[in-house]
Each structure stands twice: as structure tokens, then as C-alpha cells.
Amino acid sequence: MTKAEFTILNHLYERGTERTNELPEVALTQILSDSLSYERLVGKGYIDRHSGKITAAGIQALEPYRVDNAIIMAAGASTRFVPLSLEKPKGLYEVKGKRLIDRQIEQLQEAGIKDITVVLGYKKEMFFYLKEKYQVKFIFNAAYNIKNNIESLYLARNEMKNTYICSCDNYFMDNPFHQYEYQSFYAGVTVRDRTNEMYVETDEQMRIVEMKKGKAEGLILMGHAFWQKPFASKFLELAEADRSIGMYDSLFWEWLVKDHLPELPPFYLKEYAANVIFEFDYFDELRKFDEQYIHHTQSKIISNIQSVFHCEEAKICHFRKVEEGMTNTSFIFQIDGVDYIYRHPGDGTENIINRSHEKRSLEIAKEWGFDPTYVYMDINEGWKISIYIPSFREPDYQNFDDTEKILAVLRRLHAIPVSVDYGMRPWEDALTMEELLVKKDPSCFHTFYPLKEKIGKLYQMTKADGVKKCFCHGDTYRPNWMIKADEDVILIDWEYSGYSDPGIDIGYYIVDAMYEFDQAEQFIRAYLKEDYNEQRCFHYMAYTAIIAYYWFVWAMYRESCGAIMGESLYQWYEMAKKYADHLL
């Protein structure tokens, strides 16, 4: 059966089922006017000449093209969709009165697709209602926060047949799904401007022959896809081969197709009209489409911002994500032309950070000129708003001029006449976090007891050596320093601050710089100036090991809460071990 014959026959079948909300592809009108194909179908007995309806034989002829099932990908955190994605997955937001994923499932079921599998990850429990409501199946992607959607498709490999591949956050103006599909395809539309989507080139039969990013205009991929079994099998073979390499771990599945087009079975573009398929990558895009989100987002985060600035929701705009920090997640927003940054506290941080203490420290830091960016912080929930500084640089650990700038700030900070009744105690705090870890996994810490013993010994050696406590920052690694164009230095993020040992601030800068012993001694000498002596130097070198150990245990705890710490965890372990062994 030719593509034209299939399209005509399938259209008549859809009319026979009394579907009225079909989303037509661009080529449909032209194909339906193909009288030669129509006559061939009549001649084969697939269309009744008198009634113009599909016959039983025609329906039987469609059977080899039946769609078996659908897979809906709903595992990702949609980090570009801040701030709403911090509260719940994008697929669960209502658009025009219906949740995105509910609408898509209902459209699939209306088209006769009853076998639907949803791949879950981020906030998966919020989707559980779908099982009872729609009788869908679930697959769980535990790697949703470290791998992209190829992992979701690979985990669903046993469901792959003649299958729709869907994203939970697509919005179709009408129903694009059918009980029968002719060939493997990806939906797409023509755009007249540059976007961040994948552009495609096609041949005369609309087979995709090239895929590329960054064109000025053309056909882009957008919406659902359909894979026939041979295409799915080859895709999964390629995905399997990449699992030991990880080249595509951070990429969308389209990239694997792009790089292997010649090896894959034919893959076609099904073009739709403009403005019938929508993807809301950013919250501002959703606001343009559904006006309820201009004034009534029903978002706790937006409400928080409103309460601070006493403004209408519509004035809060231009949301942009910030690369996730080690402790929290943040995003930028704008009010009346001024950019601010909102910090959303990370999971598990309530067990290791006292937010009322942090707020007091932020007030002190602003009062004394160390952090003029602070606007507001909520001590109950831990969210914070600051002025966004768009242009600055971080210090260069190997640049002596930068070192002098940093040390000048630290000397001034450690000299302010401020005393508070809280502060970081890296040894004791590490023991507390170890207890939290061991509650989750009693055996997780066994191999680190020798290092723990050395750090404990160093701590005891520094307790009575005369170094006085003072007001400290507690988290002096490079990303918390801003050197502005006028060389003014700002120190941000005061979560770990308080009345503590100054070795914490000096030691952590050394740890993050991964200084060798001679570089660390030079840094300590420059900090202490005329107060330098061997005993003082030992104290700060010891605290380099102690604070590295603290952050190592902290990283283990954060990973136990689901965070991804990467190589930092190992670097902290190595620096703690290296300095402890050197000093003992």
C-alpha cells in the first residue's frame, strides 16, 4: 500500500469512528485529492464506491499498520521551567484547564491506544494517581537527574513495538494520534526564525536526511514520534552500545538518531501547521499561551516573591535557571527591570543548616558591607532572595593579586566586633552527619574510620593552641566570591557562617584551590602577616584537613539525600587525607 493510499484509507477509517478532533498533517488535503490513489482503493474493494466509506476489507488492510502502544516520558526535572518545576513536574501543570499529561493520555485513549507506559523519575509519587485513573503502567528511572531521556527509553525497551514516543509536557491543539501509522516519523513544524530546537532536512518523500542545530529557519522537530519495531530495535541496539561509553548520557534521544541516520531504518517527518503543537520550555512561554499564569499561577514560590516585593504576579517575569549549586537550586527573575536571584533550599538541608542563624549572618554581612546583595530570607522554609550580579569574575587561585583581595576581606571579616551564639564546628558537625549516614546505611562509613581517627587527633591538637574564635563565613570556596569590574569584592552564601575558628575560612580556600603544602604555607603567612609563627601555621594547616573532612562527610550525606556531588567528594577526601598524613 502506498503512503497516499494509506492516508486516504486511514482518514476514512477515522471518519467512520466519528472522530471530530483530529489534528491533520500539512499534506493531508493534497493527499485526499489524489483521485488515482482513491480509485485504486475502490478497485481493491477497500472503499465502497456508492457510500464512499471504508469497507471491512479496507479495515483489514490497515491492520499491519496498527499502533501497539505508547510510551510517555515523564522522568525529567525540566530545570528550564523554573520556578514551577521546583514545586512539581511540568507534565502535571494545568494548561487551559487540563493537566498536560492527563490531556495527552486521554488523546491517546480516544485514538484507540490503550496500552500506555509512563516513565517516571523526578517527584514520581505525584504521578501515581494516573494508574487508577487511566490504568497506565509505570517504569521508574532512578538516573533521571544524571542522564537524559535516552535512559528512559532504554528502560522501556521491553515495551517497544510499534510505539508512540511521547513527552508528558507537549500540548496538542487537537488529537494527533491514530490507531494506525504508516511509517516511523517525528512530528515537526516550519519556523521562520532561529530557535534552540533540532532542524531537519528532508527528501521529496519527507524522509529525514540531515539533522542540525542553529539554523535561521526551516523544519524543526516538535511533538510526538512513532517508531515501527525495526526502528525501535536498531535505536535500542545503538543505545545499548553507548551504555559503557556514556557519550549520549546528557543528550536528548534525537542526538543519537542524528548521529546514526544512515544506520537506522528510514525516519520521516510528519509536518503539522504552525501553532498547533506546543512545548513550554520556559515559564514565560506558558504565560503567553495560558493567561491564567499571568495573574494566578497558584505557585508558592511566586507567592513568596510577591510577599517580599508587594507587586502583582504579572510583574514577576523573565525567569532563567542558574546552574544548580551544591546545596540549593536557584533561578533568576526580574521585577521592574531589576534582576534578582531566588534560592530554593535543597532536599535534606534542613537537617544540617539552621536557617534562623543564616538569616542573622546575612543581616550582619549586609550591615558590614560584605554582601550587599541580600534582600530577604524566610527562616521557616529556607528560601532567599538576593540582587543578581550579572558581571563579575571569580578569584584565580594562582593569581597573587586576587589572593591579596581575598585575604583582605577575610582579615576584615575576622576582625569585626560581632559575636553570635552559633557557628560551624566542623569536627562535631561531621560526627552528627556521620550519625545520619549510618542510620541510613550502617556499613557506609567503615572504610573511613582510619581517616576519622587522624582528623580527630588533629582537632584535639588545635583546641588549646590560643587561636581565638571570630565571626567566619564557613564556605569560602571560589564560587562564593565575586570580584566586580571595579575590583570590589563580594562574599555571598552565608549558610555555614557564625562564630567559629578562622581556620575554617583559610583552610577551605586552600582545600578548594588544592594547594600544595608550600602554597598553603605561603597563603597562611600572607593572612597572618606579623602574627605568623610555626604554631599558628600548624593550626591553619590542621584546619585545612579538618574542614576538608567536614565537606567530605557533608558530600556523602548530600548524596544519601539524592544530590550528585561528582568529583568534589573525592577531592575533599583526598585533601583531608593528604594534609592529615603530612601533619601527623
Each model region followed by its residue ranges:
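Active-site activation/catalytic loop segments of kinase-like enzymes and analogous catalytic loops
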Residues: 206, 503-532, 545-563
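An alpha-helical support segment within catalytic cores of ATP-dependent transferases
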Residues: 300-315, 418-474, 485-486, 576-580
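ATP/Mg2+ or Mg2+-diphosphate-binding catalytic cores
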Residues: 284, 290, 294-298, 553-584
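N-terminal nucleotide-binding beta1-loop-alpha1 segment
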Residues: 16, 51-86
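ATP-binding pocket architecture of kinase catalytic cores
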Residues: 320-427, 442-449
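Conserved beta-loop-beta/alpha segment of the NTase-like Rossmann-fold superfamily
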Residues: 125-198
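Active-site acidic catalytic loop and adjacent metal/ATP-binding pocket
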Residues: 320-342, 457-506, 518
